[in-house]
Amino acid sequence: MITEKIDNISVTTKANVYFDGKCVSHGITFTDGTKKSVGVILPATLTFNTGAPEIMECVAGACEYRLAGSDSWVKSAAGEKFSVPGNAKFDIRVAEGFEAYHYICHFG
């Protein structure tokens, strides 16, 4: 099931802009203190570093990702999630000519 709406949150109004604008996100905080980010990745191949473990939930579009130590790219489309360990790197790519990858990043 795709998350379409998130209620009862506080939103950081200034965007986090990475990789010359290829990735843009906003931080959100729930009333219980849980933090997530909601964002979009435009066509590109990018490498991210994690602090805490992350679950990337695709809400629209698609991407391919590759976890550190792997040679294989794995597709993730709307309604799918993938997990990334804490203190790790992962690559993500969105193909040119395709819809941007819209996501929710669940931390911890």
Curated annotation (Swiss-Prot):
Keywords: Glycosyltransferase, Transferase. It catalyses: a purine D-ribonucleoside + phosphate = a purine nucleobase + alpha-D-ribose 1-phosphate; adenosine + phosphate = alpha-D-ribose 1-phosphate + adenine; cytidine + phosphate = cytosine + alpha-D-ribose 1-phosphate; guanosine + phosphate = alpha-D-ribose 1-phosphate + guanine. One of its GO terms (cellular component) is cytosol. It is an enzyme of class 2 (transferase). The keyword Transferase applies. Pfam families: Ppnp (PF06865). One of its GO terms (molecular function) is thymidine phosphorylase activity. Its EC number is 2.4.2.1, 2.4.2.2. The keyword Ribonucleoprotein does not apply. HAMAP family: Nucleos_phosphorylase_PpnP. Belongs to the nucleoside phosphorylase PpnP family. Catalyzes the phosphorolysis of diverse nucleosides, yielding D-ribose 1-phosphate and the respective free bases. Can use uridine, adenosine, guanosine, cytidine, thymidine, inosine and xanthosine as substrates. Also catalyzes the reverse reactions. This is Pyrimidine/purine nucleoside phosphorylase. It comes from Polaromonas sp. (strain JS666 / ATCC BAA-500). The gene is ppnP.
